[in-house]
Amino acid sequence: MSGEVDYGFGDLMDDPEDYCPPTPPPTSQVFTMQSGKPITLHLVGASPTEAHHLWNGAKMIADFFEEDLSRVKGKTVLELGAAAGLPSLVAAILGAHKVVVTDYPDPDIIRIMQKNVDECDETVEPRGRIVDTVDAMGFVWGADSVPLLARLNPTDDSHKERFDILILADLLFRHSEHGNMVKTIKETLKISRESVAYVFFTSYRPWKKELDMGFFDIAREQGFEVEQIAERRLDKPLFENDPGDLDVQKTVKGFAVRWSAEACN
């Protein structure tokens, strides 16, 4: 506006260079199982590891378990990069023997995961079953796996026991971490044709879907067999305003990663 008066404040009202905006508050969502049971899930308000999202891959794995209880009932389960931990909670509800739910060792993320475990326990009979079944802990992909294995049998110092089931939900966009993810699978998945790592994901950046799929090349190189076992096209993508092929962004794919017969001999 012409004729404005400069009162000499200059840039006084601008944010200082070292200003850090406040972290968004935690959020919550309700996931309803096919049985009709609601599960309240708390999420951190923001996270550089993307733990503030309830990913479509996690929802689809939860449904996948409920469609056939034998996939988790009585089994030991490890989830990597779990965020809210939805598949782990569903596995515990459906009768898994032991569940270890992990994400990056950020105190806020682990606190939220534990809160979800505690609140889920309050809705399941008998009380105490979920908290006794599910351990929430921090873990960096590719790190020493002994602390994970120790949760299966704390009194066994050999840590030879491994997990029947691994869960990786919407992690493959972390291309630089594929090798570390496979390393952890290799060190924690029971060497048996019956054990399986479930890898469900969407290529949220469609132009990088080949890089997402590169995870399975690394898995094959490390002695695993890979089989696509599920695919679902959703009504809308998780991120509605993102660029790229909309059909790819709405599609969730599920793969089973298993030890080869040769590796099991």
From Swiss-Prot:
Its EC number is 2.1.1.-. S-adenosyl-L-methionine binds at residues 55, 81-83, 103, 141, 169. InterPro entries: EFM7 (IPR025784), Methyltransf_16 (IPR019410), SAM-dependent_MTases_sf (IPR029063). It comes from the Eukaryota. It is found in: Cytoplasm. GO terms for biological process: methylation. Pfam families: Methyltransf_16 (PF10294). Gene3D superfamilies: Vaccinia Virus protein VP39 (3.40.50.150). Its main location: cytoplasm. One of its GO terms (molecular function) is protein-lysine N-methyltransferase activity. GO terms for cellular component: cytoplasm. SUPFAM superfamilies: S-adenosyl-L-methionine-dependent methyltransferases. Keywords: Cytoplasm, Methyltransferase, S-adenosyl-L-methionine, Transferase. Belongs to the class I-like SAM-binding methyltransferase superfamily. EFM7 family. HAMAP family: Methyltr_EFM7 (MF_03223). PANTHER family: HEPATOCELLULAR CARCINOMA-ASSOCIATED ANTIGEN (PTHR14614), PROTEIN N-TERMINAL AND LYSINE N-METHYLTRANSFERASE EFM7 (PTHR14614:SF10). S-adenosyl-L-methionine-dependent protein methyltransferase that trimethylates the N-terminal glycine 'Gly-2' of elongation factor 1-alpha, before also catalyzing the mono- and dimethylation of 'Lys-3'. This is Protein N-terminal and lysine N-methyltransferase EFM7. The lineage of its organism: Eukaryota, Fungi, Dikarya, Ascomycota, Pezizomycotina.
